[in-house]
């Protein structure tokens, strides 16, 4: 026999898939049925306690902020160009415009697994990896050039980190306009893009980035919206995907079906004409970062 609150969910939500997603979120897994009843009840009690810390107006304001965020990140279609998924079919793969020949690729935070970098190298692009958390490049290829440095904004730079401007200088890339940037630096991206100049950001023909900390209940959310607006002045989003590893963390705050890390693919706005993207997200190009949980449905803009 299921606990009483499970039977209530089943009665109120007739859609089987949606019902299962709610259960997954509440219990932070897909195999919740085999857990002990006491563990399930303890987790549900924890969720209720978190939710009680907010009132209805808090959630109205929070979802209003999420609405602002989605408006800033509204994706557009590039007229005359189609997206493709590059890299892994799971976490580590991204939807972007297929790069033409002769591009330069920057990979900030290569990590222990960077399938997109290897694909880019195999297609003939020169890939410059920067990651101070690993000893060497995860893959060996003559087109991959590894640097054991983390990335920082100028105001936070240290002898062991590199700024975007310093990398341009080191590699002789000042003025280059054919650079594709892939960046996933676990929150440090905000200071980098807050301080980057318009001249520097325009050197990137595509930016594939994971923005972290996009919960309206997190401190600094309004600052992050301002930085996203700054990026949108020169770069247009063409693809949006939410990392579903944030399910449990946001569910504990009462934000069901939400994640606070967004994977966004941008192109330089000057390079294309655009039209509204009428697709429902996630699309066929997407895959859940955590395959054990369903992807987060955004829908249509």
Predicted features and spans:
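Boundary detector for helix-to-coil junctions that initiate low-complexity/charged tails
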Residues: 1-47
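SAM cofactor-binding core of SAM-dependent methyltransferases
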Residues: 81-159
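Short coil/turn segments at beta-strand junctions that form active-site/ligand-binding loops
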Residues: 101-103, 125, 175-179, 203
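Active-site flanking residues adjacent to catalytic metal/cofactor-binding acidic residues
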Residues: 108, 130, 181-183, 209
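Short acidic, Gly/Ser-rich segments with clustered Asp/Glu that frequently serve as metal-coordination loops
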Residues: 111-115, 180-192
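Short, glycine/acidic-enriched loop or turn micro-motifs at the edges of active sites
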Residues: 134, 153, 185-189, 213
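A short alpha/beta connector and helix-capping loop motif
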Residues: 191-214, 218-228
């Amino acid at each position: 026999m299921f606990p009483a609150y499970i039977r209530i969910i089943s009665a109120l939500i007739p859609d089987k898939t949606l019902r299962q997603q709610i259960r997954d979120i509440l219990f932070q897994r897909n195999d919740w049925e085999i857990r002990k009843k006491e563990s399930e009840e303890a987790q549900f009690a924890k969720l209720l306690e978190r939710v009680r810390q907010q009132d209805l107006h808090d959630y109205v304001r929070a979802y209003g902020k999420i609405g602002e965020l989605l408006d800033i990140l509204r994706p557009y279609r590039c007229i005359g160009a189609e997206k493709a998924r590059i890299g892994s079919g799971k976490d580590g793969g991204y939807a972007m415009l297929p790069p033409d020949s002769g591009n330069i690729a920057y990979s900030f935070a290569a990590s222990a697994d960077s399938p997109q970098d290897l694909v880019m190298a195999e297609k003939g692009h020169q890939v410059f990896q920067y990651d101070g958390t690993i000893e060497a490049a995860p893959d060996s290829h003559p087109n991959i050039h590894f640097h054991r440095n983390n990335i920082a904004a100028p105001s936070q730079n240290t002898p062991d980190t590199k700024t975007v401007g310093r990398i341009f200088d080191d590699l002789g890339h000042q003025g280059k306009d054919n650079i594709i940037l892939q960046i996933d630096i676990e929150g440090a991206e905000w200071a980098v893009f807050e301080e980057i100049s318009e001249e520097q950001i325009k050197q990137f023909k595509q930016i594939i980035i994971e923005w972290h900390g996009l919960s309206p209940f997190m401190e600094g959310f309004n600052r992050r919206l301002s930085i996203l607006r700054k990026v949108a002045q020169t770069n247009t989003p063409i693809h949006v995907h939410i990392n579903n590893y944030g399910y449990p963390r946001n569910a504990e705050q009462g934000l069901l079906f939400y994640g606070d890390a967004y994977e966004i693919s941008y192109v330089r706005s000057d390079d294309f004409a655009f039209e509204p993207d009428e697709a429902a997200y996630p699309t066929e190009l997407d895959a859940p970062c955590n395959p054990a949980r369903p992807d987060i449905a955004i829908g249509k803009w």
